[in-house]
Swiss-Prot record:
The lineage of its organism: Eukaryota, Metazoa, Chordata, Craniata, Vertebrata. The chain crosses the membrane at residues 183-203. Residues 35-182 are lumenal. This is E3 ubiquitin-protein ligase RNF13. Residues 1-34 form the signal peptide. GO terms for biological process: organelle localization; positive regulation of JNK cascade; protein autoubiquitination; ubiquitin-dependent protein catabolic process. The gene is RNF13.
Length: 381
């Protein structure tokens, strides 16, 4: 579960990084405004900035080429004159309209009804570019042609050199920048997914660490089951291995199943907040009776190996013996070993005596006269 969440988070992070880099690179390459390329009779070229309207169709990707015609009337608030007739039906005409006196959507709709393929609306007494919009849904549904907005200086230049009467033509270049909601919404979705995955990963890890720490610590009810001994002079315990202070009369000692004793104030925080093991021998400190942990959990804990696990684990039988039993068994073992050593010594002495007798006999044999040995050899043959 944790591994799969980590893989998902890694994938989401990679996607987020790639999308962010590509998005910024894409936005830096995109133009913020469309352009109008104007060609006069002598093939002279000039470029004008424009701003597309928020209604109507978008310009085709290859651009829209057409002949520029001045609107009659110029404000196009009423039906305007249609474009001139030409033999080539594929020829497009673009109308130039003046701003003010009526809404933008009315101007563009009148241009569409007159037969124009696009409309250019110019500002009055200003070169500022305005984003043309509309609040009338019924009119918006009827508008099919694209339209752009230009400044007054650009409109004057177009009228002087690039109209249809003067042999010029224009090309409306579309803008390729996407609206804000086109890339902002996917960006926010990806960021949200990454944050959700990170939160899930952190919560899962916190729960697992909390469960692992709780499993490795001793509960309060388990701690109460461990015996407490009041120290008296003459006891076999002498020094607390945690605080290194000598025991005094009346000190409360916590006796662990491994027979190690510590001050209650020293060992209790260790058992309940750190690990339920003996600080010295690392043996598990679990009450022998009434332990609520299952055998499966205890076996799993015993099989777990960590950096704190001792290289030589104490035998299970040792955990149930007291210091007196340990000393008694140790003395009994020493007596047994000493008796064995004595028997071995006696055997060694007997064997050494036998060997010495054999050696003496061989020496005696070797000291016998040569003729007797020859005689024995002859009889043997």
């Amino acid at each position: 579960m944790l591994l799969s969440i980590g893989m998902l988070m890694l994938s989401a992070t990679q996607i987020y990084t790639i999308v962010t880099v590509q998005l910024f690179a894409f936005l830096n390459l995109l133009p913020v405004e469309a352009d109008i390329l104007a060609y006069n009779f002598e093939n002279g070229t000039q470029t004008f900035d424009d701003l597309p309207a928020r209604f109507g169709y978008r310009l085709p990707a290859e651009g829209l080429k057409g002949f520029l015609i001045n609107s009659k009337p110029e404000n196009a608030c009423e039906p305007i004159a249609p474009p001139p007739l030409r033999d080539n039906s594929s020829t497009a005409f673009i109308v130039l309209i003046r701003r003010l006196e009526c809404n933008f959507d009315i101007k563009v709709l009148n241009a569409q009804r007159a037969g124009y393929k696009a409309a250019i609306v110019h500002n009055v007494d200003s070169d500022d570019l305005i984003s043309m919009g509309s609040n009338d849904i019924e009119i918006l549904k009827k508008i099919d042609i694209p339209s752009v907005f230009i400044g007054e200086a650009s409109a004057n230049s177009l009228k002087e050199e690039f109209t249809y009467e003067k042999g010029g033509h224009v090309v409306l270049i579309p803008e390729f920048s996407l609206p804000l909601e086109y890339y902002l919404i996917p960006f926010l979705i990806i960021v949200g997914i990454c944050l959700i995955l990170i939160v899930i990963f952190m919560i899962t890890k916190f729960v697992q660490d909390r469960h692992r720490a709780r499993r490795n610590r001793l509960r309060k009810d388990q701690l109460k089951k461990l015996p407490v001994h009041k120290f008296k002079k003459g006891d076999e315990y002498d020094v607390c291995a945690i605080c290194l202070d000598e025991y005094e009369d009346g000190d409360k000692l916590r006796i662990l199943p491994c027979s190690h004793a510590y001050h209650c104030k020293c060992v209790d925080p260790w058992l309940t907040k750190t690990k339920k093991t003996c600080p010295v021998c690392k043996q598990k400190v679990v009450p022998s009776q009434g332990d609520s942990d299952s055998e499966t959990d205890s076996s799993q804990e015993e099989n777990e190996v960590s950096e704190n696990t001792p290289l030589l684990r104490p035998l299970a039988s040792v955990s149930t013996q007291s210091f007196g039993a340990l000393s008694e068994s140790h003395s009994h073992q020493n007596m047994t070993e000493s008796s064995e050593y004595e028997e071995d010594d006696n055997d060694n002495i007997d064997s050494s005596d036998a060997e010495s007798g054999v050696n003496e006999e061989s020496v005696v044999v070797q000291l016998q006269p040569n003729d007797e040995r020859d005689y024995r050899v002859t009889n043997t043959v």
